[in-house]
Amino acid sequence: MKRNFNISGMLEEFPNISLLDIHYYGLKGYGIDFDSEHGERPKFHIWDLNSLFSVVPMQPDITSPYTFKSDTLTFNGEELPFNVQFVKWIKGVPSYFYYRNIDEWIQTIDNEIVLTTNFQQRCKGCSFCCRDLQDKLSNITPKKGMDLVMKDRQDFYNIGELAVVTGMFRDEDTTINHLSEVTNIARNKGFNGHLFYIGTQVRTEKGIQRLLDNLNGVPLRYSYALETFIKREELHPLKVLPLDEIVDTVRMLKQSGVWKMEYGYMPGIDNLESFYQNACKFKDIARPHVSIFRPINAEQSKLVSDDCQSDPVRYLCKMREHFEKLYGCPIYGNNLGNLWTFPINRINPIFMTGEPPNGR
């Protein structure tokens, strides 16, 4: 049986949220019913006059009101009233690095070019991770990883953000050494942007000061990988700390000189009551780095809160409204699972042509 929701009712209840964004939450919350012979997933760009978003379902969902069939994406059997571009089928091939830019047909705020590295593939630190790469990629050193990056480029002058998803290292010192070496290699090749670290392992005053000293003026954006307020024992079995201790740690990191302090958060896991009770604790010290939770199997589906499972669009609208109330504005970002879609006036207009370069 198909699940469904009332579009007009949502627009009436949330008058400040657009029809495009309502459908964005619908696609995130209900998924897409599609056929794939080889485990591939469809990628779409969808936009109107004001906003654009990308969506890639994690797995087919036969209960979804959204269906992709015969190259057409529909809602309850009708085409969406927007520009809809089917980009390509995603194979989910693991990689040590990737770019967010025009060449990869991934939009970014203000046309920033982002290089994301993940040289620590064999991790198993978080139960929510969507990739199981134990038998596919091994851990490699920063030098070997950056050598792979340099095979296709001469320098790093045009890279605005160097993002490092570290995985779980042996200890804080090893994490700092990795971040420092990756950044220094890039800087020696002309990098003059900022470092974006997503993780939890740099969390002492001594450690953060050593990292900042090693970066030697490179601004640090740090997203502390919290993900949930109340189910951290299930998602982070190897790195659980009491929430109040995490709040104190994030405050210390910010006061130590971190350029932009954030905390990773995944809507879909916490119930709304717990979200309302705890989001305010970070208001004055960090912004959320949001990525809507999308389970990839039955086991992960157990992590979805009853609030989200029963009414995902209303749930996501309420979270968005509360974040905007706390911070006074939308929280735009380059993460494709954000609660806020990309403003048209802040992305490259080429994305509205529907013509990926080189047939990508």
Identify the role of each PLM range.
Residues 206-210, 274:
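Short acidic active-site motifs
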